[in-house]
């Protein structure tokens, strides 16, 4: 009989301070980068789009000149889209298994998806991928109640369709939501800082960060606008010194 994990109990064991409110988003973006590492397509075709979604309710205020201006509002949902391998049988089975060893060589502990539910109400996943020479679509919700529906994979009766996986983090909880700055540029900087080891390899996919108010950043281009400093990384396993970008300039 397989061992099952109580999702609510597992999430309850996780400690996540409000200062680390963006870690669930970081986990999602890193998952997308790693998925693209494993797929055999040209780097120029690899792409990740991060949608930072604000509340649809528009708030306004009066500025010093008496003009009515729109105020920025909190991010309430995030959506990360990539064209990587997707939730095929192997990756989906790993998702269902706590402390999975599938990506242990990449430094993954196998509990990141539980981190999602510490800061968000639920996660919706929609993945279109190719397996056994057939196109499949897998769609499900992940919440404290587990995965629903359990039967969530279907074969698509088509010859070709875009490979795409969308992970939607829905319902940003407090105190995490209020701990994140409103500014999209600030979010861009934090994503670059967290994912810096991937950016300095030269093989990072195109990563676009955008909100639903018309602002956007190409993170691969943005990181070149940082001042240079020396960062020491230990690589396989000899220490190497690499020049990277860390202190911020304005991101335009």
Predicted feature locations:
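GHKL-type ATPase core
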Residues: 103-218, 222-230
């Amino acid at each position: 009989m397989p061992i099952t994990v109580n999702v609510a109990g597992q999430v309850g064991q996780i400690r996540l301070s409000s200062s680390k409110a963006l870690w669930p988003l970081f986990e999602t973006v890193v998952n997308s980068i790693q998925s693209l590492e494993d797929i055999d397509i040209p780097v120029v075709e690899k792409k990740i789009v991060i949608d930072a979604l604000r509340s649809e309710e528009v708030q306004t205020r009066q500025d010093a000149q008496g003009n009515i201006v729109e105020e920025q509002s909190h991010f309430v949902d995030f959506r990360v889209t990539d064209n990587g391998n997707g939730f095929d049988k192997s990756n989906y089975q790993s998702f269902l298994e706590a402390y999975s060893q599938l990506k242990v060589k990449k430094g993954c502990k196998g509990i990141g998806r539980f981190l999602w539910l510490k800061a968000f109400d639920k996660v919706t996943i929609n993945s279109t991928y190719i397996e056994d020479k057939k196109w499949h679509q897998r769609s499900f919700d992940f919440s404290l109640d587990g995965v629903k529906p359990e039967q969530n994979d279907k074969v698509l009766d088509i010859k070709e369709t875009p490979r795409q996986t969308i992970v939607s983090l829905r319902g940003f909880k407090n105190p995490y939501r209020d701990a994140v700055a409103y500014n999209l540029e600030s979010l861009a900087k934090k994503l670059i800082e967290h994912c810096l080891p991937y950016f300095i390899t030269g093989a990072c996919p195109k990563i676009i960060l955008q909100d639903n108010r018309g602002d956007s950043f190409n993170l691969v281009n943005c990181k070149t606008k940082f001042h240079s400093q020396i960062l020491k990384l230990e690589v396989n396993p000899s220490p190497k010194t690499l020049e990277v970008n860390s202190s911020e300039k304005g991101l335009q």
